[in-house]
């Protein structure tokens, strides 16, 4: 009877093993489209029999999932890189739409700049024309509106990024908590059974992959099957069965810029977070801030140059011109952790030498250090109270303690605040402040009043008329063929100079305060023959001239920001945004290709192949039928034995 009993038990083990194998195949087939599912297979071993005899059937030792750690990690890393690249591409497309490119490399703001300067040239054709002046003022207002529109679109894009940032952080926290919960369940089942809880492992691996789409991570396998998860910078998101949260906070300067902090200790992780959607958002934000600063810089450069030129000319009422544009100045924010009472204010004194960008100024024991936020470049400054940085003049007030810091945003608010200051066409200072009239001269030279110049470097030998005489009539009289004097309206000598028959002579009338040194009205005496007694009258009030509006129109071709013209600076911005967009597109395509390849490799190992499962099902069905036949044979033998008794 023992042999027949063993035969029956052997058949039962085969039947049980085949049943479990069929169930496994069925589970594989049912989960063919389940994200994160790893195909499973049955591991069997023979039940050993007596020495020298057959075994006692089979035993299912485990249900093993086809999991390859290397292939899985490749998918995780590729998912993180791809999501970052796709996020950057999407946000770069948004940025590119704000700076359209038309023929000639300009569009939007570039076209508005061109129209403004073209209208200035129209005024120069007929400076007394009210319609020309009104058209110029209309283009100035349109230009200001375009600046504000671009600034508003950039601000809206920034708000959108802030929303994306908050959403990504919330998703990271949710996934981290779910992974920690699964860690607890996996550890419990592993300790209780000693086996691998395949379904829970699949779920956790899928959550880890989803987490990698949100932020770059690394993982470490712990005891009892738990998995620890860290950001690329080393902050623990999951440690065993505990999850740690991230939070979105305002930076310590209170300027409204969000930062990502680590809840357990409040550490700012913003600069250490890479990969995934969060890394893509942070990268996109740096591009956006750069564009905001550059557009703001254009507004500041244009305002400074046009207003300065306006101040050198006369309006239709015979008065020196007032500002045409207004724009918000630099903003300095004190860190909330400062211990001193100090404050900073700043002005952009020289836009030509200024490169738009934001800085953090930190007080050290030896003075101030300025760190360029975009590049990390550190510049050592003095102790104050006046500091000079890249075209900026910074004034320090109060008591600044060592370690105190300030965030300086020179042009962040400029574009949205850009506006015209007048609606009166007669306020346009189109005229040069002086006109020249020749006396009854015997010589053949001419005197020409040039366009007012700001920040001029005068050639050697220039006769400079003091600012105290500005706005008064003066006269130039030759005392010989090679010398001349400049006389005030009271016939006092206020300047003198030498004259060359081959090169002429230069005279400059200095502007009064608050105009800076170097602001002058140039007067040129042409080459030729001068005779003692020859004279020229230089009189103010030439409101019908166009000398100063020509100077305003000429600003289109002068360097006004970072050593560039307005047009070239804007074209460089558009080109940069366009190239960044193309680069982001190529990177996104490459990242998607890498991810697809990694997924295909991983699926070839761990994915469900329905053809293979169909073949397995037939094999296990036959095994089941064979095991059932063994049981039936054992039953027949039992019946034969009983019938023989």
Where are these regions (language model features)?
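S/T-rich, low-complexity, solvent-exposed segments of bacterial secretion/appendage proteins
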Residues: 1-645
């Amino acid at each position: 009877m023992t042999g027949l009993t063993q035969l029956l038990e052997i058949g039962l083990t085969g039947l049980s093993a085949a049943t479990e194998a069929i169930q496994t195949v069925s589970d594989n087939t049912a989960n063919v489209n389940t994200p994160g599912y790893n195909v499973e297979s049955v591991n069997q071993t023979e039940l050993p029999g007596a020495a020298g005899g057959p075994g006692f059937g089979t035993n299912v030792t485990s249900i093993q999932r086809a999991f390859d750690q290397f292939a899985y990690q490749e998918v995780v890393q590729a998912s993180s890189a791809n999501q970052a690249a796709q996020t950057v591409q999407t946000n770069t497309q948004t940025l590119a739409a704000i700076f359209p490119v038309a023929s000639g490399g300009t569009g939007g703001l570039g076209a508005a700049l061109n129209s403004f300067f073209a209208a200035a040239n129209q005024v120069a054709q007929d400076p007394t024309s009210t319609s020309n002046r009104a058209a110029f003022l209309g283009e100035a207002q349109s230009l200001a509106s375009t600046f504000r529109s671009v600034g508003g679109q950039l601000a809206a894009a920034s708000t959108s990024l802030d929303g994306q940032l908050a959403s990504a952080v919330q998703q990271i926290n949710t996934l981290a908590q779910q992974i920690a919960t699964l860690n607890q369940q996996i550890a419990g089942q592993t300790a209780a059974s000693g086996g691998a809880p395949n379904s829970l492992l699949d779920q956790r691996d899928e959550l880890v992959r989803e987490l990698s789409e949100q932020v770059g991570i690394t993982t470490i396998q712990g005891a009892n099957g738990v998995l620890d998860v860290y950001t690329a910078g080393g902050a623990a998101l999951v440690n065993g069965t505990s999850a740690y949260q991230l939070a979105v906070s305002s930076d310590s300067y209170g300027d409204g810029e969000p930062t990502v902090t680590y809840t357990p200790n409040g550490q700012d992780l913003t600069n250490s977070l890479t990969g995934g959607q969060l890394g893509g958002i942070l990268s996109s934000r740096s591009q956006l801030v750069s564009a905001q600063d550059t557009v703001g810089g254009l507004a500041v450069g244009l305002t400074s140059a046009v207003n300065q030129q306006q101040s050198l000319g006369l309006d239709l009422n015979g008065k020196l011109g007032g500002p045409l544009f207004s724009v918000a100045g630099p903003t300095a924010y004190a860190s909330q952790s400062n211990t001193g009472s100090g404050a900073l204010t700043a002005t952009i004194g020289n836009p030509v030498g200024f490169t738009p960008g934001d800085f953090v100024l930190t007080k050290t024991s030896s003075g101030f250090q300025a760190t360029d936020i975009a590049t990390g470049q550190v510049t050592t400054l003095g102790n104050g109270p006046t500091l000079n940085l890249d075209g900026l003049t910074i004034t320090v007030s109060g008591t600044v303690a060592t370690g105190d810091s300030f965030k300086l945003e020179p042009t962040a608010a400029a574009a949205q605040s850009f506006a015209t200051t007048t609606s009166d066409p007669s306020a346009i200072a189109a005229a040069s402040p002086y006109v020249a009239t020749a006396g009854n001269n015997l010589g053949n030279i001419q005197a020409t009043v040039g366009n007012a110049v700001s920040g001029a470097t005068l050639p050697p030998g220039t006769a400079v008329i003091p600012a105290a005489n500005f706005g008064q009539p003066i006269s130039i009289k030759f005392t010989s063929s090679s010398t001349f004097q400049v006389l005030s309206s009271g016939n006092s000598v206020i300047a003198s100079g030498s004259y060359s028959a081959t090169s002429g002579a230069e005279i400059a009338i200095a502007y009064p305060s608050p105009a800076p040194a170097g602001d002058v009205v140039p007067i040129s005496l042409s080459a030729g023959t001068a005779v003692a007694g020859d004279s020229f009258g230089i009189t103010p009030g030439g409101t019908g001239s166009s000398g100063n509006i020509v100077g305003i129109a000429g600003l289109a071709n002068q360097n006004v920001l970072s050593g560039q013209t307005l047009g070239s600076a804007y074209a460089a911005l558009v080109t940069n945004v366009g190239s960044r967009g193309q680069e982001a597109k190529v990177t996104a395509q490459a990242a998607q290709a890498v991810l697809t390849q990694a997924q295909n490799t991983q699926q070839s190992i761990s994915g469900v192949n329905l053809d293979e499962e169909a073949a397995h099902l037939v094999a296990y069905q036959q095994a089941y039928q064979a095991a059932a036949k063994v049981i039936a044979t054992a039953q027949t033998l039992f019946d034969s034995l009983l019938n023989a008794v």
